[in-house]
Amino acid sequence: MKKKTSLACSECGSRNYTVNVSGTQKETRLEVKKFCRHCNKHTLHRETK
């Protein structure tokens, strides 16, 4: 079953994106480089709960 989580900017902390991830337990969190409209640049976004 898919679980909806959000991606937060590592610099400013704003939650800009939502993604569907698998519900199984995993060791690492998803990290993607995406555009942050608050920082106005591409930053690393990490999976949050």
From Swiss-Prot:
Gene3D superfamilies: Ribosomal protein L33
Keyword Lipid metabolism: no
Keyword entries, A-Z: Ribonucleoprotein, Ribosomal protein
Presence of keyword Ribonucleoprotein: yes
A GO MF label: structural constituent of ribosome
Pfam families: Ribosomal_L33
Biological process (GO), any one: translation
InterPro entries found in the cross-reference section: Ribosomal_bL33 (IPR001705), Ribosomal_bL33_sf (IPR038584), Ribosomal_zn-bd (IPR011332)
SUPFAM superfamilies named among the record's database cross-references: Zn-binding ribosomal proteins (SSF57829)
GO cellular component labels: cytoplasm; ribonucleoprotein complex; ribosome
Similarity field: Belongs to the bacterial ribosomal protein bL33 family.
Protein name: Large ribosomal subunit protein bL33B
Species annotation: Listeria monocytogenes serovar 1/2a (strain ATCC BAA-679 / EGD-e)
